[in-house]
């Protein structure tokens, strides 16, 4: 069982933990401060998104499992990170000034998709090659037509 827990010295900064049902032990999987120790600076869009979702903490605030359960994907300070369960290694997938949001694994787990500056991107996890699928996000086309239907349609043809 995995869960988010605030640090003992800062309850508003969350780390990713695991509870082992067999051994009945808790252990930290990802220490958010080991990946990013500074003060998180949120974009206005991210502040609004967190406010709508009533999220008031920092650190790792959400995470997603790959379909086969072998990896986790999570945002931290606007960038995306990948954590492999077996190797226990985290790696930064993106490093930009803009925030990557709405990150998801592809069904096969070899790509991640996300939104940056209102455009859809896909990143190959192994090669870290990034492909920008849309270029008109600033014209409100994506916002008005809905991200999810467009993302599904685009990814089905791409992957």
Q: Model-predicted segments: where are they?
A:
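Beta-propeller folds
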Residues: 1-159
